[in-house]
């Protein structure tokens, strides 16, 4: 009779275990998918947050940590998710509208008049005449808290599932499986350029399912989830006149079809210009080459081809082949469809959807001209690393790659609105070091010396050892450029003398002449290990320090509020493992960006690989009951030490296996050892919810420590990770507890 009576209870237990197993998978999917969605959406609508996407990343980790710690609370935090999310969305949209419709509102990003770090697009409103100035640190702190609160509910579900599921490592494996599904699903939507409303429809479906499983789903919550999806869909379908919005894999793109304007994440990015009407600076390098006695460039490489302006001008001046490299498929498609000169339809153009640095490293072609065409991405490459999409184009090693693909008499040209003289000095110094010849620097409007550049100063840096252009300037002193491109075809800018022309013929002429640039042997180069072109020196900017302090205080406050009452119970081993692993992920992201490009696809592949390595580590711990942590720590320390001490330049030459395989091993190898250490430690932890919450809290600290890369470089950042791992050894069982 006892056995018969026990059967329903056993069946209920098995059913509950199966439900928790499925919940672990679903919440793994939800957290990863929601994290990526928040990074993309809030970067698009919160003014200038695209330069600080790690705020959304760290907030998601903090919220998950707090949720795990609240696993034993009676309050159901997932029920609050739609209301918190809707509030965060409405606040973001209100700020977006206020910033773009009220000239008196300015968001200050580190004082861009004399900055320690330059952020393109943040300086167009003058703080001196503004009525209301908000520091970016305040905005970052506000959304740090709001996004963190969004993740408390999913984190609580995760903690409760870990508490209930009998086999923790198997449960963690199921959770990682859900995360893998989440990254695949979001990557598929990014490839399809799906709108944000669809992202959050999937999020709300997952939240609704978890609420239904818990028996807490009611009409009010269903209505709130529907309102959230509708609220997130409305901004995507706002169309003013001929405006169209596209969610590319990198940005929210605002395209004014009639005006030819392209904005990304609320910041002006580029204009589509007809050769017949405007854009003479794009012709300048071709005119200088032609009138200094050079033959038209035959083979041209344009990196940052965008909508096609630079490609158009290369074709107009006789190029027989133009390789047009653009990283963003949506911007490239806009150029194909809407550029009035149809450059992408020309059979001489070979479009490449690729990262510029990866193309330079992988191509065997040789070029007469390599052009960096207004390369400024206006966004970070990843929330895991403080680098931008173009960071690895402007390093000393990248310029060596350019030199390799140039023909003996080839020219390398870079142009942009660089904002600060020290950026121009750094680029010019790196170019001279790479090519052995001093570059020619031109400024439009003309500046005798590159110093205190105005915001509208277009600077061109001509590198390489082709001396024709420099000799022509030495002979003629000036070059005259007409602002209407077709008119330049009929004049020689070197021999033209404006004083001999009628006033109406000189109205559109601009004087071009070399500008003096002050740099010396002590000028700091950007390198593949320290790829911070826009950072004035090896320093952490003041506003970044303020932000770190503010986020740190807010994070500690939230953890304190969500910890079980009456005690402080962080599992210190798990905490330090989380901090260290975050830095391993950072190193992996930047290493793969150098090797394979800074594309969204490479980024997705990196995180997919990391999750696979964690999965393999879990399977190992499931199979091997007695895991000796000592040997795994020794292996981890050795491979981390090798990664931190072996110079990255060692891998720049040699066979494919050496150039690609060895760096991948050093970047990804530690994660297998670290995964085994984590899985074994998690299996033996007395309280899985607090252990996992402590680990995620450590990830927040690791994310803040990533800012040390601006001081140390990414290679020596591994020493910080090594320190965290040593601290995890120091406290092997480790709970800091006080009753």
What are these regions (language model features)?
Residues 2-739:
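Alpha-helical transmembrane segments of multi-pass membrane proteins
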């Amino acid at each position: 009779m006892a056995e018969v009576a026990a059967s329903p209870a056993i069946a209920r237990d098995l059913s509950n275990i199966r439900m928790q197993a499925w919940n672990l998978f679903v919440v793994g999917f939800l957290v990863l998918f929601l994290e990526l969605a928040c990074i993309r959406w809030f970067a698009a609508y919160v003014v200038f947050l695209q330069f600080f996407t790690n705020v959304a990343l760290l907030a998601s980790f903090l919220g998950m940590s707090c949720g795990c710690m609240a696993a034993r609370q009676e309050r159901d935090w997932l029920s609050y998710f739609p209301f918190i999310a809707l509030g965060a969305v409405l606040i973001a949209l209100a700020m977006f509208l206020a910033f773009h419709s009220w000239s008196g509102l300015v968001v200050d990003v580190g004082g861009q008049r004399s900055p320690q770090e330059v952020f393109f697009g943040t300086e167009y409103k003058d703080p001196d005449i503004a009525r209301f100035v908000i520091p970016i640190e305040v905005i970052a702190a506000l959304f740090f808290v709001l996004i963190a609160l969004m993740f408390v509910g999913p984190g609580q579900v995760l903690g409760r599932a870990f508490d209930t599921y009998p086999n923790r490592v198997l449960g963690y494996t199921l959770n990682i499986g859900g995360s893998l599904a989440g990254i695949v699903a979001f990557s598929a939507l990014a490839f399809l350029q799906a709108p944000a409303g669809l992202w959050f429809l999937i999020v709300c479906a997952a939240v609704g399912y978890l609420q239904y499983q818990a028996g807490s789903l009611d009409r009010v919550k269903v209505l709130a989830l529907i309102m959230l999806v509708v609220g997130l869909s409305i901004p995507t379908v706002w169309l003013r006149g001929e405006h169209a919005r596209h969610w590319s894999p990198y940005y929210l793109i605002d395209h004014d079809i009639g005006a030819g304007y392209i904005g990304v994440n609320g910041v002006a990015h580029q204009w589509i210009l007809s050769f017949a009407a405007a854009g003479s600076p794009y012709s300048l390098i071709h005119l200088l080459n032609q009138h200094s006695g050079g033959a038209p460039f035959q083979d041209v490489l344009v990196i940052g081809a965008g909508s096609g302006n630079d490609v158009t001008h290369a074709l107009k001046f006789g190029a027989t082949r133009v390789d047009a490299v653009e990283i963003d498929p949506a911007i490239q498609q806009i150029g194909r469809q809407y550029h009035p000169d149809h450059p992408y339809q020309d059979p001489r153009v070979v479009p490449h959807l690729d990262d510029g640095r990866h193309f330079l490293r992988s191509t065997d072609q040789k070029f007469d001209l390599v052009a960096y065409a207004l390369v400024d991405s206006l966004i970070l490459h990843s929330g895991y690393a403080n680098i931008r999409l173009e960071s690895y184009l402007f390093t000393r090693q990248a310029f060596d790659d350019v030199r390799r693909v140039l023909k003996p008499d080839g020219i390398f040209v870079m142009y942009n609105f660089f904002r600060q003289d020290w950026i121009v000095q750094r680029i010019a110094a790196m170019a001279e070091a790479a090519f052995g010849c001093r570059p020619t620097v031109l400024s439009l409007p003309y500046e005798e010396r590159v110093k205190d550049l105005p915001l509208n100063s277009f600077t061109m840096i001509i590198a390489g050892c082709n001396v024709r252009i420099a000799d022509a300037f030495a002979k003629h002193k000036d070059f005259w450029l007409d602002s209407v491109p077709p008119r330049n075809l009929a004049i020689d800018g070197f021999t033209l003398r404006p004083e001999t022309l009628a006033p109406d013929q000189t109205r559109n002429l601009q004087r071009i002449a070399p500008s003096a640039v002050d740099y010396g042997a002590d000028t700091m180069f950007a390198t593949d290990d320290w790829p911070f072109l826009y950072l004035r020196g090896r320093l952490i900017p003041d506003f970044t320090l303020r932000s770190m302090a503010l986020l740190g205080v807010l994070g500690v406050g939230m953890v304190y509020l969500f910890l079980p009452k009456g005690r402080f119970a962080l599992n210190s081993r798990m905490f330090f493992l989380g901090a260290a692993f975050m830095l391993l992920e950072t190193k992996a992201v930047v290493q793969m960006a150098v090797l394979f490009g800074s594309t969204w696809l490479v980024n997705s592949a990196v995180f997919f690989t990391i999750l696979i390595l964690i999965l393999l580590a879990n399977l190992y711990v499931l199979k091997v009951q007695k895991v000796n942590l000592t040997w795994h720590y020794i292996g981890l320390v050795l491979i981390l030490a090798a990664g931190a001490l072996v110079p990255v330049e060692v891998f720049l030459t040699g066979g494919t296996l050496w150039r690609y395989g060895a760096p991948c091993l050093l970047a990804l190898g530690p994660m297998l050892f670290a995964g085994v250490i984590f899985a074994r430690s998690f299996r033996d932890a007395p309280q899985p919810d607090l252990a996992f919450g402590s680990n995620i809290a450590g990830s927040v600290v690791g994310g803040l420590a990533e800012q040390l890369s601006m001081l140390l470089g990414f290679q020596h950042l591994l020493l910080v990770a090594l320190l965290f791992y040593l601290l995890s050894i120091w406290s092997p069982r480790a709970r800091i507890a006080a009753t």
